[in-house]
Every structure is written in structure tokens, then in C-alpha cells.
């Protein structure tokens, strides 16, 4: 799919990997809609890229009504939707048995709800609008890109909720791709390694240093623009479907 003149929704688009994806898509000629809760940061992005190119909608992706309302606004403002990128998510540090007590159940449920249920929620509602598109010259109506993590493949000590939620996103990928194939909508997932995002920058050295050691070549943290480059390629390469792609320097 050619990104020029297309409409892309990006959850978590106000920072980190999502922001880089918004910027890359706009650079390719797309209109971008940021679904996030950080209005201040989104406003800065809109100021830099232009109000005619980027729109912000404050959205709780874990709830049905706000996402339905957001997608309806996209339809009203742009006439349709071609691409959805799910970048919104977070983690919760804690072992299953901590020093004081077991891992809090409510924290586990929140992470799974945000990272996995939120992704599915946006995917299903976005796909409904994409299905109304006329197929392009390659017969395609839409592309959905989800964000997992190598933690969902390799596991990560002290991140049971995060790892489980991202494993769920990976497990969803091929099923979603096959479900939506009859609607001419592709689904792929990116599983990033260790990236230099605002969240990672807040981590203490005792957390960052071992993670950096686990990278192979190049021996460094990934940059958000490298994630965005892959998000661009997935859209443009029509034969990519149902894949979970590791982006981790061979960790």
C-alpha cells in the first residue's frame, strides 16, 4: 500500500515508537491520527508537523465506546481509515513472588487489559471501518500493525504481566491475519528488542546496562526511527501478512 494520501491511526502516538511512526507516515504523505492520553505532547507533535496532517483524539483504548467514538471522528474528518498501528502499552516490574507479597493481581490485569485487550479492541473497530474502503490497485483495503516485544518470545524476569500480554499479541497475529484476509486487510506484528524510548531513559543504570549487554550487532539500543522504518515497510510490502518480526539486533 502506498502511504501517500492514506489515513493512519497510531495508538501511543504521542511519544516513543508511536511518535516516530507518526512522523515517518506523515513524511510519506499520510494523514496521522494520534490516539493517546497525553494531549500536551500530542499538541507539540501537531505544531511541528502541521494541523492539516496530524489530529489528536484523547482515547482510553481499553474501553469500547471511546474507541468507537475515535474511529467515527476519523471517518468524519478524513472519510476513512487505511492503517492502524497499536503502539500504546506499558509494563509493571515485579516478580510473581515478591519480597513482601505475591504479584498484585490488579496490576497484572491492568497490563493485560492495556497491552492485549486494548490492542484487540482497536484492531477490531479499525478493521470495521477499513472494510468499507474500496480496494486499491493491489486489491488491498487496510493494514494493521501491532507491537509486541521480545519479552513475549523469550520471557523477561520480573515482567510476567508484560511478557504474558505481549505473548498474547503475538498469538493473535496469525489468527487476525487469517480472519481479516477475506476483507483484504493485512495484519503484522513488530516485536522490538531494547529501544531508546522515554520509558527506557527513566530506567536506572542497573536495569539499562544488562539489557544493553544482551544486544548483539549493532551493540546498542534501537532507535525509534528504526521501528518506524519497519512500520513503513510493512505497509508498503503487500506480501507481508501474519508475521511477527523481531527487531532486536539478534538478542
Where are these regions (language model features)?
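C-terminal substrate-recognition "lid" of short-chain dehydrogenase/reductases
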Residues: 223-247
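Conserved mid-core segment of classical short-chain dehydrogenase/reductases
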Residues: 91-109, 128, 132-138, 158-161, ...
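Catalytic Tyr-X3-Lys loop
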Residues: 90, 101-121, 145, 169
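Short, small/polar-rich loop/turn modules that mediate ligand/substrate recognition or access, typified
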Residues: 181-186, 240-243
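Residue(s) in the substrate-gating loop at a strand-loop-helix junction
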Residues: 149
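Active-site helix of classical SDR
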Residues: 123, 165, 173
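Alpha-helical segment proximal to the catalytic Tyr-Lys
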Residues: 128, 177-179
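Catalytic Tyr-x(3-8)-Lys segment
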Residues: 113, 205-226
Amino acid at each position: 500500500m502506498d502511504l501517500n494520501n492514506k489515513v493512519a491511526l497510531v495508538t501511543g502516538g504521542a511519544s516513543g515508537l508511536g511518535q516516530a511512526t507518526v512522523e515517518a507516515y506523515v513524511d510519506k504523505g499520510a494523514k496521522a491520527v494520534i490516539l493517546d492520553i497525553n494531549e500536551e505532547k500530542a499538541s507539540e507533535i501537531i505544531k511541528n508537523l502541521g494541523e492539516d496532517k496530524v489530529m489528536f483524539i484523547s482515547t482510553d483504548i481499553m474501553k469500547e465506546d471511546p474507541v468507537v467514538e475515535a474511529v467515527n471522528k476519523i471517518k468524519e474528518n478524513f472519510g476513512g481509515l487505511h492503517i492502524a498501528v497499536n503502539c500504546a502499552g506499558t509494563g509493571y516490574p515485579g516478580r510473581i513472588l515478591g519480597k513482601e507479597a505475591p504479584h498484585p493481581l490488579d496490576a497484572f490485569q491492568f497490563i493485560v487489559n492495556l497491552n492485549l485487550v486494548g490492542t484487540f479492541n482497536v484492531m477490531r473497530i479499525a478493521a470495521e471501518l477499513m472494510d468499507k474502503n474500496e480496494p486499491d490497485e493491489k486489491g488491498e483495503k487496510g493494514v494493521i500493525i501491532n507491537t509486541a516485544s521480545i519479552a513475549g518470545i523469550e520471557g523477561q524476569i520480573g515482567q510476567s504481566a508484560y511478557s504474558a500480554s505481549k505473548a498474547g499479541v503475538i498469538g493473535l497475529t496469525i489468527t487476525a491475519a487469517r480472519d481479516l484476509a477475506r476483507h483484504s486487510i493485512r495484519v503484522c506484528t513488530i516485536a522490538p528488542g531494547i529501544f531508546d524510548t522515554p520509558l527506557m531513559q527513566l530506567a536506572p543504570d542497573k536495569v539499562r546496562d544488562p539489557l544493553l549487554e544482551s544486544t548483539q550487532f549493532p551493540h546498542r539500543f534501537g532507535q525509534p526511527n528504526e521501528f518506524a522504518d519497519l512500520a513503513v515497510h510493512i505497509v508498503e510490502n503487500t506480501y507481508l501478512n501474519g508475521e511477527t518480526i523481531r527487531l532486536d539486533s539478534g538478542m
